[in-house]
Structures are given as C-alpha cells and as structure tokens.
Amino acid sequence: MIRYTQMFGKEWKHDHKNFAERKVNMDRNAPIGVFDSGIGGLTVAREIMRQMPQERIVYFGDTARVPYGSKSQETVLRYSRQIIRFLKTQGVKAIVIACNTASACALETVKQELDIPIIGVIYAGARTAAEATHNGKIGVIGTEA
C-alpha cells in the first residue's frame, strides 16, 4: 500500500521547496485533482480519501484514450497537459498523476510548467516496494512509452 500522506509531505516538500516563494494563493478548501489513463487511479483517489478524509477529490479517468502505454511520449505529454488544464479549471490545489505511464513521460515536464504542486506515483510505489522486499530484489514491469 502506498502511503500518500508520506508522499504528499516528503515529496512535495522536496519538489516544491520554493513553492511558498512563488506566492501562489492556494485555497485550502480546493480539491485535489487525480488523473489516470483509465479507472485504475480510482484506487489512488480512494487511498487519498481514506488517509485525508477532509480533502475533496476531482478524478479524471481518460477512458476515451486508454491505454497510454502504446502511445508515444509526446502523445502522453500532450494528453497530460490537456487533462491538467481541465483540472485547473476545476480549481484544484494540487494534482496527482495516478498513471505510471503519464508519471514517467510527463511529470518532470509539467512540474516546470505549473504553479501548483504535482506528484506522480512511481516514486512512492518504488519506495514501498523497496521497503517490502525481503531479498533486495524487485521486479519492474512497464509499458512501451
């Protein structure tokens, strides 16, 4: 199980250490945006709601263009930007990319483009796997993108 409270705290502090300096006005009551290429990211949204029940979630599952794994990196980046624009129109205060493919292909680029915190799931998943292994070995399965 991914510990999203740790992920929100530690990774956001690291990735957005200068966030406060940007003087972004963030409504504490604004929802958190979560997106995936389909419905699998609902498990991420559910865990966020379990660990942070006071938070509201706006979920976007891109079932019209699923799967992302067979798409080019440029296409995944374009889709991610489109979804992020939509989520921003919903007034989200932060975004979680709950799609491994989009996290791998788009996260670093869109972090530089946004004025709100954005995180992916790869780091937290890798950390959880590393903590869970008993023999020091981890298998990784990925998509073509």
Model segments located where?
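Intrinsic-disorder-associated, low-complexity terminal segments enriched in Asp/Asn/His/Tyr and depleted
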Residues: 4, 15-18, 25
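Non-catalytic structural scaffold of enzyme domains
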Residues: 23-145
